[in-house]
Amino acid sequence: MGSLSFALPFAELEVGQHLYWQFGNFSIHGQVFMTSWLVIGALLALVVVGTKKMERDPRGVQNLLEFLWDYIRDLARTQIGEKVYRDWMPFIGTLFLFIFVSNWGGALVPWRLIHLPSGELGAPTADINTTVALALLVSLSYFYAGLSNKGLRYFEYYVHPTPIMLPFKIVEDFTKPLSLSFRLFGNILADELVVAVLVFLVPLVLPVPVMFLGLFTSAIQALIFATLAAYYIGEAVEEHH
Amino acid sequence: MDSITTAASVVAAGLAVGLGAIGPGIGQGSAAQGAVEGIARQPEAEGKIRGTLLLSFAFMESLTIYGLVVALVLLFANPFAG
């Protein structure tokens, strides 16, 4: 089977086809890189434009950025706690904005107009490699947060209520990145597939409400990823008494 | 891939999503029930309840999504394709 593709002008459905770039011994998925660079560029441009001429009464882009800053600060503060949330706010904010803009960019930008020799452009988060990388970053950072805040006392967390919990907590370290990455990847890919299949079956009107539902779930998934990352970091820095 | 592997993969993909949807479906139902009762009892807390409900919905939904990932692997990246 390998991969699947139907050929209708706007209803192509391709899974498992990629634009491979050779990079030394590695072959990388080029379409994912292109869209992630676009997302990063868009975010950078937004931030640069919004902070160029800052005013006391925020207007336009600055207003939007301040709203986002407040939102991310509240998210980080409720999950990580008053003491160290400030250190981790940039990380949580970056995760949230990158995932959010990737998800919405994949759904809103008419990528199908751009033809690639193989594969197609879409949300970078619909590729398992992106989400695994993000989830592993979260794993590394909660270990780092725990070790740098509490030193070796961090490992008390593994035996915290009773030592019986030790195997479960160790398994948890592996299941956390697994579930984080699969949840995001699966949701975004499922959204794209559902819309693609509906467009393939009924090209008019019917896919539109499903697209809105997709936008909604994509936003929620970005929020969940950021919330969980913050929660894991908060769990690692929390003091037990 | 021989036809018996294909048939088994397709059936398994259907079962993975179908069976995986049962549990989260029941769970989302009872979560929604709790939320509606909460809102009926205390309409001013609607915003907070809605936020928590959506977040927990996403967690339940991800269980079905795991089934979907398994189904997609079976259909598009089958390790037994040989």
UniProtKB/Swiss-Prot annotation, chain B:
One of its GO terms (molecular function) is lipid binding. Keywords: ATP synthesis, CF(0), Hydrogen ion transport, Ion transport, Lipid-binding, Membrane, Thylakoid, Transmembrane, Transmembrane helix, Transport. The chain crosses the membrane at residues 7-27, 57-77. It is a multi-pass membrane protein. The record marks 61 as: Reversibly protonated during proton transport. It comes from the Bacteria. It is found in: Cellular thylakoid membrane. One of its GO terms (cellular component) is proton-transporting two-sector ATPase complex, proton-transporting domain. InterPro entries: ATP_synth_csu_bac/chlpt, ATP_synth_F0_csu, ATP_synth_F0_csu_DDCD_BS, ATP_synth_F0_csu_sf, ATPase_proteolipid_c-like_dom, F/V-ATP_Csub_sf. PROSITE patterns: ATPASE_C. Signal peptide: none annotated. Belongs to the ATPase C chain family. F-type ATPases have 2 components, F(1) - the catalytic core - and F(0) - the membrane proton channel. F(1) has five subunits: alpha(3), beta(3), gamma(1), delta(1), epsilon(1). F(0) has four main subunits: a(1), b(1), b'(1) and c(10-14). The alpha and beta chains form an alternating ring which encloses part of the gamma chain. F(1) is attached to F(0) by a central stalk formed by the gamma and epsilon chains, while a peripheral stalk is formed by the delta, b and b' chains. F(1)F(0) ATP synthase produces ATP from ADP in the presence of a proton or sodium gradient. F-type ATPases consist of two structural domains, F(1) containing the extramembraneous catalytic core and F(0) containing the membrane proton channel, linked together by a central stalk and a peripheral stalk. During catalysis, ATP synthesis in the catalytic domain of F(1) is coupled via a rotary mechanism of the central stalk subunits to proton translocation. This is ATP synthase subunit c. The gene is atpE.
